[in-house]
Amino acid sequence: MATLIDNRYGKARVRVLRVFKGPNEYHKVFDFDCRVLLRGAEFSETYLTGDNSKVVATDTMKNTVYVIAQKEEFKSLEEYGILLGKHFLATYSWVNGVEVVMRENQWRRIKTSNGKEQAHSFQRDREIHSVTVTSSRDKSPVVVSGIDDLLIMKTTQSGFEGFHRDKYTSLKETKDRVFATVVTANWTYNTLSVDYSKVFEQFKLSVFDIFAQTYSRSVQETLFLIAKDVISKVPQVEQVHLSLPNKHAFGFDFSRLNIENNQTVFQPVEEPSGLIEGTIKRSHSRL
């Protein structure tokens, strides 16, 4: 005997560039990759018997992504994901759940020699804005925002001392080292009344403030302080998950060449690398 215990299906890698055109050719762009997955008990028939009568074609789903993008007004991809999930639930009564996953390329306005940001010319940043919106019938949508590929580095104000040592330990303690990492993070909300774009920018500010302005005794400490700062400054954020790989840059060994090492030349090492992760949740006081 074989039993189908779960199923979902949809369309992936739907590429969208949405341009909102305001007065005086002031444009706002959303450049993103979208994946839509549908759930529903009645979809089991297509797996078990080949009956496709309830199957919403993935081509239909792809077209819907573009139609809703043009039809609806939205200020963030989080809002767009909520609208898209609402559409599928309202249109197809047998759909019980919708998951919309998006990865947005970040474009900032070009600043020209006159010091002004241009209304419709953009330069792409490295980091990615990630969004997952899960919509279920008779429940509020669950929104998870995130960031990927935010590469940061500082060349001092970081150390690593006092760690456990045993017979397999070769790492030397240091009060001063290069600290580089690629920030991957996501966060959940305790409400849907959120300025999602503002929260995204605040998250980056918290990363920059903690990373640049505090001495790091460990990647773990820096991770916690970033999440703590976000939670303290954004009351709508309920939980933060961070992943920080330690992108090592070791001092080059000049001793082999009988040259003094003045700690200004380093050798970046891509792998292996440390990987530090943590999830921090808002504490609620008990009365």
UniProtKB/Swiss-Prot annotation:
What does the UniProt keyword field contain?
Answer: Oxidoreductase, Peroxisome, Purine metabolism
Pathway listed for it is: Purine metabolism; urate degradation; (S)-allantoin from urate: step 1/3
Which residues are catalytic? Answer: 11, 58, 248
- Where would one find coiled-coil regions in this protein? none
Instruction: Please cite one Gene Ontology biological process associated with this protein.
Output: purine nucleobase catabolic process
Q: Where is urate annotated to bind?
A: 58-59, 160, 177, 219-220, 246
Q: Where in the cell is it found?
A: Peroxisome
Give the SUPFAM superfamilies listed for this entry. Tetrahydrobiopterin biosynthesis enzymes-like (SSF55620)
Check the record and name the InterPro entries matching this protein: Uricase
> What EC designation does it have?
1.7.3.3
**Family, similarity comment:** Belongs to the uricase family.
What does this protein do, in the record's words?
A: Catalyzes the oxidation of uric acid to 5-hydroxyisourate, which is further processed to form (S)-allantoin.
| Protein name per its UniProtKB record | Uricase
Q: Whose protein is this, by species?
A: Dictyostelium discoideum (Social amoeba)
